[in-house]
């Protein structure tokens, strides 16, 4: 465990000079790094009416840990998956199976769907800006998969969806088993604090399938997505990840960082999430 912590710290501490400018939700990423360094928990809010992932935990190798002292006023769970040893470390299984909106973390798979259908390709992922004025300067420009993922450009992935069509998107969501597979929300925002939800454990399972290409998709498409979510590299390994921020009435209520660290001899999957408990009543009412 100490060796793993050291590797995570070394990788996470290396950042390109322009990284802060390129990645939307950098605050969430910094928080994640701090949490990792202290082996502190993934934090989430609890709502009795939220759907849950029915995980067959009895067939898994799980180490249950107690990180209660780190929570303060929050409730939640910590999830870590060690791929080589096939071991899960979990604090609070109830929160680890709780499904919430994926927000921009879903863009990993939306991009993959677009690549599989040829809407974009690894060689040509260009989509022209339509001239509409967006709240973030980086969004007001033509985009490629790399730039759209780095700046979390909503309109780029909405354009991919529009070209795919709801039927094809839903087929892919079912094929990979994405969370609750619920696209009943508005087609432009079903993944943004709407109908589509996923749990931290499911996020890890899907990232594992992405890493191993258990989907059976074209290898060049898998690699294109992995390249788009690569955050930093060092001699000890490479950090991949994606942030996601949920907003209700102009306030951030749900922040994700999902990702994994690939070293020479292992891969560690890390999906911490932070939700402000004070915002929960308003957020759940608006879902």
Role assignments for model-derived ranges:
Residues 2-58:
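Cytosolic-facing loops and C-terminal tails of multi-pass membrane proteins
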Residues 45-68, 72, 162-167, 208-236, ...:
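Structured C-terminal helix/loop/strand segments within mature extracytoplasmic catalytic/sensor domains
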Residues 137, 144-145, 157-208:
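Mid-domain, small-residue-enriched loop/turn segments at the edges of structured enzyme/sensor domains
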Residues 99-124, 148, 270:
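Active-site SXXK
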Residues 112-120, 162, 205-212:
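Short glycine/serine- and small hydrophobic-enriched flexible loop segments
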Residues 47-102, 118:
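Short pre-catalytic segments that frame enzyme active sites
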Residues 115-132, 218-221:
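Short, well-structured active-site flanking segments
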Residues 91-97, 141-142, 150-157, 184-191, ...:
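Flexible glycine/proline-enriched surface loops and loop-helix/loop-strand junctions
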